[in-house]
A protein has these predicted regions:
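Macromolecular interaction modules
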Residues: 1-101
Length: 101
């Protein structure tokens, strides 16, 4: 069943606009292609305006896990840290749907 890599980022308010532009123009398009994801979506929380969430869709959990532990992902993490270390705190979750109605 479909799986998602969910990346939650808490963004320092002083860099929110730069982060948003970078994610829109560079990171999301590059990640979609490199991750071989089915789709990539992102947005800002309406509960906490400094929380950014990105969703990368995969056909199944195996595909998402393969990406999560790949050299590709390590490279993306390294590049992200070059831009945003100390300004953005993020976490990752893998979720496989167990039910769809």
């Amino acid at each position: 069943m479909t799986a998602y890599l969910i990346v939650r980022a808490e963004v320092d308010p002083s860099v929110k606009s730069q982060f948003d532009a970078w994610y829109q123009k560079e990171h999301l398009p590059d990640a979609l292609k490199a991750f071989h994801a089915v789709t990539a979506k992102r947005g800002w929380s309406s509960v906490d305006p400094h929380v950014h969430i990105a969703f990368y869709e995969f056909p199944d959990l195996d595909a998402a896990n393969t990406l999560l532990h790949s050299e590709t992902m390590k490279g993306f993490i390294k590049e992200f840290d070059l831009h945003w270390v100390g300004k953005v705190v993020r976490s990752r979750e893998l979720v496989e749907f167990s039910q769809a109605i």
